[in-house]
Amino acid sequence: MRPFIIGIGGSHSKVGKTTVACNILKKFNGWGAIKYTKTSFYSSIIDSPEILQQENKDTSRLINAGAEEVLWVQSPFENLQEVLQIAIDRLSHLKGIVIEGNGAIEVINPDIVFFVSANEDLKRGSEKVLRIADAVMFDRYLPKETPRTATKLHINNEEDYINFIMRRLRIV
C-alpha cells in the first residue's frame, strides 16, 4: 500500500518549505522525507548518511526533525517521474512521506499539496504548483494567483497545518 504523501512546494527558494516539512515530521512518527533538487545531466538517489547529515543541509534538518528515513533525489525534470517513483517505493514501508520540491509535486499525485509563500512574488513555473495546492501557507501576503478553493494558513501557525493534515488522515 502506498504511504500517505504530502508535497511541499513554494514560491521560491528559502521561503520556508523545509521548516514546514520539519514541523510535520516532528508531529508524525514513522514518516520519511524526500528532498528533490533539479540537476542538468544526471539522476541519483542519495541515501548516504555522511552526505545527508552534513551540517546546514536541508536533509540533515529533516533527519533531526525525526524523519525515519530521508532520501535526496537529484534529477533532470524529464527523468524525475521514474527516479522519484523508485525513491517512493524505497520508503513505501513508512506511514507517510513528505516530499519537498515543486518539480516532484508536478510528476506525482500527493494526497496533500502545500504551497509556501513569503510574499506575492512567484518564481517562474511555481504557479503550476500553486494552482493545485490544497493549502497555501503565507507570511504577509497571499500570492495573487491563490486558488479560491485553497485553504489559507499562516506559515507561523503550525497547529493549523498539522490539524489540516490530521483531518485528511481522518485522525480527528
Feature map (PLM): residue ranges:
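Short coil/loop residues immediately preceding or within conserved phosphate-binding loops
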Residues: 3
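Glycine-rich phosphate-binding P-loop
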Residues: 6-24
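Short beta-strand segments
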Residues: 9, 35, 99-100, 116
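N-terminal phosphate/diphosphate-binding loop that engages ATP/GTP or pyrophosphate donors
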Residues: 22-75
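Short, high-confidence coil segments that cap the C-terminus of an alpha-helix
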Residues: 31, 67, 92-97, 110
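Short, well-ordered secondary-structure micro-motifs
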Residues: 44-49, 82-83, 109, 126
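Phosphate-binding/switch loop-helix module in NTP-utilizing enzymes
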Residues: 73-105
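Conserved catalytic-core segment of NTP-binding enzymes
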Residues: 89, 93, 102-172
